[in-house]
């Protein structure tokens, strides 16, 4: 099993212009190219395991993909083809859930699978509403776990679905299915989750309206009557990936980082605002706004204090493990609630965060929907990543104040292939098998 050791770091100042491209937008760019009848041009596509798996699935569905160093050109098929083999989503819940929605209205038979971690994640939250409108989806655990076998239906019923949870993946899957339904459809959620799907599809010409109604965020979708316009997009840097280095600057004394060309979508920068609330100096500089607002984020070290986080959880669900590291060195108590979704991510992130913090000498306890962390002095420890890229990267960042060894780090490649290269610019990194 591979491992990485990092030594305690001194202060640093760093400008990072090559944060990994945004994973959410990369997935969607590849998928949504299938909704046009003209080639889509994608610059700065994330070349990580998860998104490359999505690109391979797009090829298997009939698209031609031309790749160069700077851009990807995707030529969609005249109609999506039934693949000859199983579609492998790797570690990506986004890939599996969104492809279920995309393929629900396509005539054909499709089998979606993934790695051992993805095959244990719940899929009924997408499969059940799709079944209710006419798609045939089955799988392990009564259709709740992959591999999933899907037979599309070109006669999907119109629907009005009230999601019990705020989930960008559930919402996006249903929006994609709605584009091929027989009539207008609506999806609502109790809070606004990430809205890349709505923004990008509207930018491609889809008739999608978003608004608040009776305390719920609502998306109204008119089915397609013609192919959408092709994408011409340069994918910004991923704020979820950038946030690891924001935490690094916040916890390392006399440190500062400039994170360039990040998407500043309000549903993606909530964790930075929490870090700001904890006492870190955080500045947002917007530079452009087409499909998404894009700009720079500057984070400078300052003394941190505890914080309670219970609102807008869907906006920072992926950043909570890294935020837990800031909480661990902050003065006082921090509490995270309403984050039960952490238990069904790539790992049970509530248990993994709490148990690993305890190894580092930090007082922490689990709740069913979150945890409590008492800030203190981090100690060096041997950490198990739980096969989860965000756990691995979070505790490597923790090593900046104490030194740390993190085991099973291959998972980092699923989202942030150059993470260790960037980390080595601010701290000594030792890799081993």
From Swiss-Prot:
The active site is at 318 (proton acceptor). It catalyses: 3-phosphoshikimate + phosphoenolpyruvate = 5-O-(1-carboxyvinyl)-3-phosphoshikimate + phosphate. Its main location: cytoplasm. GO terms for molecular function: 3-phosphoshikimate 1-carboxyvinyltransferase activity. GO terms for biological process: amino acid biosynthetic process; aromatic amino acid family biosynthetic process; chorismate biosynthetic process. It holds the Pfam family EPSP_synthase. Pathway: Metabolic intermediate biosynthesis; chorismate biosynthesis; chorismate from D-erythrose 4-phosphate and phosphoenolpyruvate: step 6/7. Keywords: Amino-acid biosynthesis, Aromatic amino acid biosynthesis, Cytoplasm, Transferase. Phosphoenolpyruvate binds at residues 23, 93, 121, 169, 349, 390. It comes from the Bacteria. GO terms for cellular component: cytoplasm. InterPro entries: Enolpyruvate_Tfrase_dom, Enolpyruvate_Tfrase_sf, EPSP_synthase, EPSP_synthase_CS, RNA3'P_cycl/enolpyr_Trfase_a/b. It is found in: Cytoplasm. The keyword Aminoacyl-tRNA synthetase does not apply. Its EC number is 2.5.1.19. It is an enzyme of class 2 (transferase). Monomer. Belongs to the EPSP synthase family. This is 3-phosphoshikimate 1-carboxyvinyltransferase. It comes from Nitratiruptor sp. (strain SB155-2).
